């Protein structure tokens, strides 16, 4: 059974979308293996977004991600990584199809180019393992 890391970002938590997102996960037939509401630290965010540190939008991204609590968790199921990414929709809300989480709930980039796109999901088994270990290290991060 494949596992992946997911996150409901500060805008999703603030707008009361936790129940909607979790309901979509469960209706899809995936299992919620872990859930935790956390206030992210700068250190966790720097590690999580390490590949984006040189981007011009990075400071705004970190400010956004530290603007409130996030819900983090692990979901499992057959081909859950690819399926969850499809359920989320394209990163940019303007490109996300209706019926996806981002298509239905995310907000277009503001005048500073900052997106509030509600959710995150690992993009590969390696990323899932790394992100589960980073955020929920007390759990097993094995992806069989």
Swiss-Prot record:
Transmembrane segments: none annotated. This is Nucleoside diphosphate kinase. Its main location: cytoplasm. The gene is ndk. It comes from Streptococcus uberis (strain ATCC BAA-854 / 0140J). NCBIfam families: PRK00668.1. The keyword Zinc does not apply. Disulfide bonds: none annotated. It is found in: Cytoplasm. Keywords: ATP-binding, Cytoplasm, Kinase, Magnesium, Metal-binding, Nucleotide metabolism, Nucleotide-binding, Phosphoprotein, Transferase. InterPro entries: NDK-like_dom (IPR034907), NDK-like_dom_sf (IPR036850), Nucleoside_diP_kinase (IPR001564). Its EC number is 2.7.4.6. It comes from the Bacteria. GO terms for biological process: CTP biosynthetic process; GTP biosynthetic process; UTP biosynthetic process. The active site is at 120 (pros-phosphohistidine intermediate).
């Amino acid at each position: 059974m494949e596992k992946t890391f997911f996150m409901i970002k500060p805008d999703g938590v603030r707008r009361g979308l936790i129940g909607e997102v979790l309901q979509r996960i469960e209706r899809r037939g995936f299992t919620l293996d872990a859930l935790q509401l956390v206030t992210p630290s700068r250190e966790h965010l720097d590690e999580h977004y390490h590949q984006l540190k040189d981007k011009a939008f990075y400071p705004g991204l970190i400010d956004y991600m530290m603007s409130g609590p996030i819900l983090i968790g692990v979901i499992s199921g057959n081909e859950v990584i690819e399926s969850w990414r499809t359920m989320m929709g394209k990163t940019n809300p303007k490109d996300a199809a209706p019926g996806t989480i981002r298509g239905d709930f995310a907000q277009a980039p503001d005048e500073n180019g900052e997106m509030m796109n509600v959710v995150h999901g690992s993009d590969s088994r390696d990323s899932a393992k790394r992100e589960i270990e980073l955020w929920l290290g007390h759990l097993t991060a094995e992806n069989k």
